[in-house]
Amino acid sequence: ANSVVGVTVLLAVLVLRQADFGIKTSHGLLSIMGIYAILIAGPRLSNMVPPFAAFLINIVCIMLLMIMGCHNVIMYNHSTFVLGYLLLQGYDVTGQDYVLRVIGLLCGMVICMIIFYKNQKNRPYKRTFQDLFYEFNINSARNRWYIKLTFIVSSAMLVMNLLNIPRAMWIGIACMSVCLPFSKDIEGRAGKRGAFNIVGCLIFSIMYIVLPKSMYPYIGMIGGIGVGYSAGYSWQTVFNTFGALSIAAELFG
């Protein structure tokens, strides 16, 4: 289950090589620390409480991830940080495994901070970390998108949890992928998702037949890495399907 930490950190590294937070680079390091603090605590807490309490925790954590990591909307950073949160929540661990998860995420945080500062140190931004919160305005299109995505993802997972359906994270990921900052893009993505989910199912079926059983646990990880390397939404959808079907195969055979 802790292999998901590697996927989460890898996706963050791939993004932070080029993306920024729209604030001073030194203050961007604070955003990275805040994001990783949420990734460490939020998923574990949400798995320790009843569904409605988990719903509230998800709202707070996802909203903070959006505020700290997604100010520069065109970077689509939410597809990395919120995805990481959902993956860690879906692959929950306890005890010594959780200790190892925390260590892995802290190491990942340091790596991300080094790469981010090295690549972004010459950015000319004057906005500070505090400004991300001071500038929050419910009337702005950006902040309305924050709220919309937060409540759609959290509500969808609440319904799954109330129905006692495992791995609620997958409906959260599906909702996140079509809840975009620019409304005109939503219809196109919704159409592509169905078509390329079918492609993903076909490729997964071939892999499931060809690969030995010892490789089955790694198909989901391959999907996570593929998402990080995919520039277009179509292939991101294909690789996301791997993870969902891996869980379905594990649960239902």
Predicted feature descriptions by range:
Residues 1-79, 83-202, 206-222, 226-239, ...:
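Alpha-helical transmembrane segments and their membrane-interface boundaries
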